[in-house]
Design a protein with these regions (language model features):
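Anion-binding alpha/beta catalytic cores of soluble intermediary-metabolism enzymes, centered on
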Residues: 1-332
């Protein structure tokens, strides 16, 4: 999977911002990326500290651009742009204070077109990586929420699972008068479509199963109606994808069960992209696949943003940073 992405990136190297340029894991991954020559890293941090940490670790980052928010020549322009984007919610002073931090500064570099993608979270929390993205980069046209998926790899086998990390549950959004502005089913449908699109980037021809404890109306209650209604909406949103549900996991992956429980479905028995009705199921599901099924898990990969921005685990190692950088750039 990674070799194919690297070959694509070599033809069109992308700029990727690392918000924690001082971190040894980021520096080790950066050195590997520089050696590979298929990405252009930009490190955020104090120049002297970043260089000292690289030298201490023996990481060659010669030629890599290092930007310090506290000495950045274009800060006034960046502050003005952020004030405009926040639409009166933050004063110039508040914006400047936020931009002194790598997470906001790096996100604005992407928003202003200086780089195409961003990877953070080695020391920042998920909230501190996602919040600036939502406030500044925002969601892409036609998408209402950010979600996530994992690409799971076992040998030559690849599957996608979403949402396993961002949306806790799906509830109707209502305005002050109590009118539904975005239904729970619409939200889950968007997760399905965005996960299918992500899967396609990684060479998966998506066959999307909307998972439940019920198959094609066999059960009632819980999130059955949510998954059923979301299936219909997702089909309308993206008729180019095979999407079906609701269905149980065995009906999704076992051809004989799929044929028995959901006859006529193009997805049942052949699914490779799995949409969970809540974060509990999603998080448990991908970890079962990882720990008992022998799949390698890559993610969470954020979806729905107007530019590729991804969040690392604070327990990540340099190899995980390296691979997530490739994944993030591949989404441009």
């Amino acid at each position: 999977m990674f070799n194919a992405m690297i070959e694509t990136l070599k033809a069109n190297p992308r700029k990727i911002v690392f918000t924690e340029g001082h971190d040894a894991r980021i520096l080790e991954a950066t050195a590997r990326l520089v050696e590979g020559g298929f990405l252009t890293p930009i490190l955020i941090g104090n120049v002297d500290e970043v260089k000292a940490n690289a030298a201490k670790g023996g990481f060659n980052i010669e030629g890599v651009e290092i930007l310090d928010p506290l000495t950045y020549a274009g800060m006034d322009e960046m502050v003005a742009k952020m004030v405009e984007l926040r639409k009166g919610k933050m004063s110039p002073e508040e914006c400047k204070a936020a931009l002194s931090k790598g997470n906001y500064f790096g996100t604005m570099l992407v928003k202003m077109g200086y780089a195409e993608s961003l990877l953070g979270g080695a020391t920042y929390s998920t909230a501190d990586t996602v919040r600036p993205a939502l406030q500044l980069v925002k969601t892409k046209k036609g998408v209402n929420l950010v979600s996530s998926c994992f690409i799971m790899v076992r040998g030559d086998e690849k599957i996608a699972m979403g949402d396993c990390a961002i949306n806790l549950s799906y509830e109707d959004s209502v305005d002050k008068e109590g009118n539904v502005t975005l239904s729970a089913a619409q939200k889950l449908a968007e997760v399905a479509v965005e996960t299918a699109r992500t899967a396609k980037v990684f060479g998966i021809d998506p066959k999307v199963a909307m998972l439940s404890f019920s198959t094609n109306g066999s059960g009632k209650g819980g999130t059955v109606k949510l998954s059923h209604d979301a299936t219909a909406i997702a089909k309308e949103l993206a008729p180019e994808f095979d999407i079906d549900g609701e269905m149980q996991f065995d009906a999704a992956v076992a051809p004989e069960v799929g044929q028995l429980k959901f006859p006529g479905s193009k997805v049942a028995g052949h699914a490779n992209t799995f949409i969970f009705p809540c974060i509990e199921a999603g998080n448990i599901g991908y970890k079962i696949a990882q720990r008992l099924g022998g799949f390698e898990a890559y993610g969470p990969i954020l979806q729905g943003l107007a530019a590729p921005i991804n969040d690392l685990s604070r327990g990540c190692n340099a190899d995980e940073v390296y691979k997530m950088a490739i994944i993030t750039a591949a989404l441009v």
